[in-house]
Amino acid sequence: MTELDKRHRSSIYDSMVKSPNRAMLRATGMTDKDFETSIVGVISTWAENTPCNIHLHDFGKLAKEGVKSAGAWPVQFGTITVADGIAMGTPGMRFSLTSRDIIADSIEAAMSGHNVDAFVAIGGCDKNMPGSMIAIANMDIPAIFAYGGTIAPGNLDGKDIDLVSVFEGIGKWNHGDMTAEDVKRLECNACPGPGGCGGMYTANTMATAIEVLGMSLPGSSSHPAESADKKEDIEAAGRAVVKMLELGLKPSDILTREAFEDAITVTMALGGSTNATLHLLAIAHAANVDLSLEDFNTIQERVPHLADLKPSGQYVFQDLYEVGGVPAVMKYLLANGFLHGDRITCTGKTVAENLADFADLTPGQKVIMPLENPKRADGPLIILNGNLAPDGAVAKVSGVKVRRHVGPAKVFDSEEDAIQAVLTDEIVDGDVVVVRFVGPKGGPGMPEMLSLSSMIVGKGQGDKVALLTDGRFSGGTYGLVVGHIAPEAQDGGPIAYLRTGDIVTVDQDTKEISMAVSEEELEKRKAETTLPPLYSRGVLGKYAHIVSSASRGAVTDFWNMDKSGKK
């Protein structure tokens, strides 16, 4: 930590020549006394379009109260969100990952443009979390991320359901196992109120990872959206960020290599989303921390999967909260040598000091399995390599009984075409469905394939049909799925030259993803193939021309590798 004036940025408004600036600020309510205090931004991704974010404006008010009670001047801002569950399976899904970097850039622009001394970022939907963290890492001023909390499970006929239940219901309906009225009942009961999607999906995965990194208050990631604990932790975030100012504590003090190792460790233990690979790489890049896909495999080999959480398990994230939450899991892992307990966090305390204040996992609970009898002996997120993905691909194998799948490819250049093939029963057991030209550049925006994967699972083919793509998968996806194939088709990766009927192998034990196509044949196909032009209009056009490979986090500022002098 370094000495940091509590008004290290807002003091720019003190001089006589800044009288016009102060005149504008007085119109917002500031007085002479307020100009003597720190200015703290509170920025949220509030929007009325999704349960993930609908409550965040009110949470922003709570964070402001926390800032004010700590003696600083709070200012509330807003930025965008794209709701994955609403965009899923539509052209809007191309804007989901794109929004991550728009969120990051807009937070940086708003906070830097108004010379705040510190800020709290509040998010709810999937890309809100990494977008906020990229901005926090790039700006490197005192900041805390506060999660809007997980949604409560829906209930139908005495059973817990969630949004993924509805997606899978479509496959069951198409297969004749569910009526349209049954699906409607799922639809009307799956989402009972505000909060991020309820399983160990991307929102909860990233909120957890940020808490483990040390950039959210201990315990906050597992507090349900409608709980009293959540309201308390949001207000506490406002107080805590002022304390960070007083301590001179910055994100660069917290976001160390060890912090990212711990975030990956807990992600593996809880069975987190494949999107964690993409987002942690991007956050590490912004934080100037050297992190690669191979680091995920290294940690995957030594960390068991312990959580019986959806999508592959039976419990939702609120159930984890009720048996001790993320701190209890971290405490268990720390006691068994899996975490770095001596690193600093946003509280000014170490990980071990924070966890000492929390209880252990509730005795007799069933959500987290013991280390001696885990759900899986190693981690469920695996990085695959081979001639189909020379730069890597990501598979989530929790709940997948098939360890090796060899079958003929059925190749599609869009998710829509693949969905149509599933609905018309063109996909048979043993097939390898391949959706390409949907990567970061090709999509553009690397859309998720939850609609497609859920239909395959709903039709009873989840363990019988493999699904491969250079796009992404929702955290709600499970089954024989491999995403993030790199290089992507749009960049001329081998997946661009795969043809229907080619034999594809996916092996989780050897971490292989390959196609039975010779180098000579591959070169011949390259000569015969013309790749489509990059998208060229609007925000997607900008994104397609600057985004990096998924194997590097799909970031949009890779031209400055060392980023020296950037901050």
UniProtKB/Swiss-Prot annotation:
Coiled coil: none annotated. It is an enzyme of class 4 (lyase). One of its GO terms (molecular function) is 2 iron, 2 sulfur cluster binding. The keyword tRNA processing does not apply. Keywords: 2Fe-2S, Amino-acid biosynthesis, Branched-chain amino acid biosynthesis, Iron, Iron-sulfur, Lyase, Magnesium, Metal-binding. Mg(2+) binds at D84, D126, K127, E448. Pfam families: ILV_EDD_C, ILVD_EDD_N. The keyword Iron applies. It catalyses: (2R)-2,3-dihydroxy-3-methylbutanoate = 3-methyl-2-oxobutanoate + H2O; (2R,3R)-2,3-dihydroxy-3-methylpentanoate = (S)-3-methyl-2-oxopentanoate + H2O. Pathway: Amino-acid biosynthesis; L-isoleucine biosynthesis; L-isoleucine from 2-oxobutanoate: step 3/4; Amino-acid biosynthesis; L-valine biosynthesis; L-valine from pyruvate: step 3/4. [2Fe-2S] cluster binds at C52, C125, C197. GO terms for biological process: branched-chain amino acid biosynthetic process; isoleucine biosynthetic process; L-valine biosynthetic process. Transmembrane segments: none annotated. HAMAP family: IlvD. Homodimer. This is Dihydroxy-acid dehydratase. It comes from Streptococcus pneumoniae (strain ATCC BAA-255 / R6).
